[in-house]
UniProtKB/Swiss-Prot annotation:
GO terms for biological process: diterpenoid biosynthetic process. This is Ferruginol synthase 1. One of its GO terms (cellular component) is membrane. Expressed in leaf glandular trichomes. It comes from Rosmarinus officinalis (Rosemary).
Length: 493
């Protein structure tokens, strides 16, 4: 009984918040009628990207949705995506920041969530001109080739023992090693080690917390109470990962101090140390460690998820697997590990990756954008402060764009010069414009080389052949992954 006045007051505040948020101009994009307080949240289901795709067929490519008190516009066509990300890219360059991202002050330092300004430009410049430049990628490819060799050796051991490989775990470890080699000239983890499991727990913990639906994001008045404990758990995971990254950085700074004449390593960590010591810009240690957090979490989670989807589609379509193996054999011959320089000679491999990204963009709604001012798009007003979600999943399965959109047909990309680098809005898994994913050059290489290494050297079969279509369920979150891990056995014919 004592709690009744508090609950009544809370209900009144929520209702008032909803009423105020709903009193908007009438020339908003069309959409389903929102219920009091909850808006359209009860309509979302477990797969919001699929729900939005269905609703957009009725309401159009610009659609209004109310997520609690958070007014949101869903974009579901390449034409409207181009308007948002290119034509009006500056207006829609803001970010809606989830409560979890406030952990350890990440929202104030992260390049992914900072407003477009001086700090953001400095960090973007480091990524574009130093970290992920073409020359940097070329200089570090020999390190990545070593890590691919380790993946091959692990798969060979499993093959000899008739042991199934959890593709998600193997892809995670390999992706983490490839990123660590590129960034730090080191191997972060070993297969089947305790360190591996700790890294996996932390990074998947961060990704799951950021991706979990949180009432405090839809009703900001609840944020101080953190009713689901999202912020508290995020502080723990973010803190653990930042401590590891800071350890890498501090160790290199100390090594530079004690051995000033030692040759520098050819990796991004040296660039970070140089940036801190020369102080050519206003970036501090925190900016760089939080940048590393973004790259490790975003890069490992999305690349891991996509590799698992690629392997699943190839297993479900054996004729595509055979075609890809034939191409790899013709180009690589007896070589075991693909060289990144061979990628232009492997058009079918490229088509397979594109087709998987079309069907299974790891982040189907991309990172949320926010309108920094009122803007009319396609005759509709998108008001200042509105959240904007680009439904890359819906665009990739649009019948008006793609023939047989639900089928895995890599051949469609052999005849079309469509790429996922941000200029073709039919295929935008990495986003586009000034907010395009900065790690795309590395992710592109990881997806192709890991897939090629697995397919070229082994034939594969499901650990449980009877578990096929029943395992197509997915889990929505930071990245949309398979609900049941893909476990497959490598073997030699």
């Amino acid at each position: 009984m004592d709690s009744f006045p508090l609950l009544a007051a809370l209900f009144f505040i929520l209702a008032a918040t909803w009423f105020i948020s709903f009193r908007r101009p009438r020339n908003l994009p069309p959409g389903p009628f929102p219920y009091p307080i909850v808006g359209n949240m009860l309509q979302l289901g477990t797969q919001p990207h699929e729900t939005f795709a269905k609703l957009s067929k009725k309401y159009g490519p610009l659609m209004s949705i109310h997520l609690g008190s958070l007014y949101t516009v869903i974009v579901s066509s390449p034409e409207m995506a181009k308007e948002i990300m290119h034509k009006y890219g500056q207006v829609f360059s803001g970010r809606t920041v989830a409560q979890a991202v406030h952990a350890c002050g990440h929202d104030k330092i992260s390049m992914g969530f900072l407003p477009v300004g001086g700090e953001w430009r400095d960090m973007r410049k480091i990524c574009k001109e130093q970290m992920f430049s073409h020359q940097s990628m070329e200089d570090s490819q020999w390190l990545r080739k070593q890590k691919l060799q380790q993946l091959l050796e692990y798969a060979q051991k499993c093959s000899e023992r008739g042991r199934a490989i959890d593709i998600r775990e193997a892809a995670f470890i390999t992706t983490l090693n490839l990123m660590s080699a590129t960034l730090f000239s080191m191997q972060a983890t070993e297969f089947d080690s305790k360190v591996t499991m700790e890294f996996k727990e932390i990074i998947e913990g961060v990704a799951s917390i950021v991706g979990v639906p949180n009432f405090a994001d839809y009703f900001p008045i609840l944020r101080p109470f953190d009713p689901q404990g999202v912020k508290r758990r995020a502080d723990v995971y973010f803190g653990r990962l930042l401590a590891i990254i800071e350890g890498f950085l501090n160790e290199r700074v100390e090594s530079r101090r004690t051995n000033p004449n030692a040759p520098k390593k050819d990796d991004f960590l040296e660039t970070l140390v140089d940036t801190l010591q020369t102080n050519d810009n206003k970036l501090k240690t925190d900016h760089l460690t939080h940048l590393m957090l973004d790259l490790f979490v975003g890069g490992s989670e999305t690349s891991t998820t996509e590799i698992e989807w690629i392997m699943w589609e190839l297993l479900a379509n054996p004729e595509k697997m055979a075609k890809m193996k034939a191409e790899l054999k013709s180009v690589m011959g007896e070589e075991k590990v693909v060289d990144e320089s061979q990628m232009p000679r492997l058009p079918y491999l490229q088509a397979v990756v594109k087709e998987s990204m079309r069907l299974h963009p790891p982040g189907p709604l991309l990172l949320p954008r926010k309108a920094e001012s009122d803007q009319v798009v396609n005759g509709y007003l998108i008001p200042k402060g509105a959240q904007v979600l680009i439904n890359a999943w819906a665009i990739g399965r649009d019948h008006s764009i793609w023939k047989n959109p639900d089928s895995f047909e890599p051949e469609r990309f052999l005849d079309q010069k469509i790429d996922f680098k941000g200029t073709d809005y039919e295929l935008i898994p990495f986003g586009s414009g000034r907010r395009v994913c900065p790690g795309m050059p590395l992710a592109n290489r990881i997806l192709h080389t890991v897939t090629a290494t697995l397919v070229h050297n082994f034939d594969w079969k499901l650990e449980r052949p009877e578990a096929s279509d029943a395992h197509r369920g997915v889990l929505f979150g930071f990245a949309v992954r398979r609900a049941v891990p893909l476990k497959i056995v490598p073997f030699k014919v």
